[in-house]
């Protein structure tokens, strides 16, 4: 076999292996919990109808203050029953979206669940040892959590994203009609 043919074969195989790795790695996501299972966790079998806050005025201003001015939505979707709200929010960690569910009860976070984790770094935010830090947290002064959230080495952006989403869930809970945290 000539050197040229070997070169072509090696090149084609290398490109195939590289593209296979790249495609599967770029599509990789870790689905931890489905939306339906998250809502069952929040409300058991009696899941309320989804509601929404229109993304304008105070809702828009507050959300963009927490998440950044480029945060745009049409509606902030939530589920509410007996003073408890559930929120499914997304935020980019370092490069890819983190989808998380937040349950707010009595103006405090009662639990956080990572639904889909797409990042290759910072995966520790998926585990209860990190998420449980948020349980019982509420907002003070309109912009801070009343609890200090410990970071994770190498996962600063994922931790910051989870913290911002927690603040957003708490703040939006307060804006839902029939709730009053202030």
Task: Name the predicted role of every residue range.
Residues 27-149, 156, 160, 164-182:
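Flexible, solvent-exposed loop/hinge segments and secondary-structure transition points
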């Amino acid at each position: 076999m000539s050197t040229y043919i070997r070169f072509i074969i090696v090149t084609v195989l290398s490109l195939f292996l590289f593209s296979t790795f790249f495609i599967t790695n770029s599509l990789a996501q870790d689905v931890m919990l489905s939306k339906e299972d998250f809502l069952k966790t929040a409300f058991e079998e009696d899941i309320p109808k989804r509601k929404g806050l229109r993304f304008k005025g105070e809702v828009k201003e507050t959300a963009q203050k927490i998440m950044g001015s480029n945060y745009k939505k049409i509606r902030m979707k939530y589920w509410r029953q007996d003073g408890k709200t559930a929120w499914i929010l997304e935020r980019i960690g370092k490069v890819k979206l983190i989808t998380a569910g937040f349950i707010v009860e009595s103006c405090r976070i009662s639990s956080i669940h990572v639904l889909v984790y797409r990042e290759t770094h910072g995966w520790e935010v998926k585990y209860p040892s990190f998420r449980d830090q948020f349980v019982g947290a509420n907002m003070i002064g309109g912009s801070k959590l009343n609890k200090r959230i410990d970071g994770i080495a190498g996962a600063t952006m994922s931790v910051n994203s989870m913290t911002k989403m927690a603040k957003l869930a708490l703040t939006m809970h307060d804006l839902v009609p029939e709730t009053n945290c202030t």
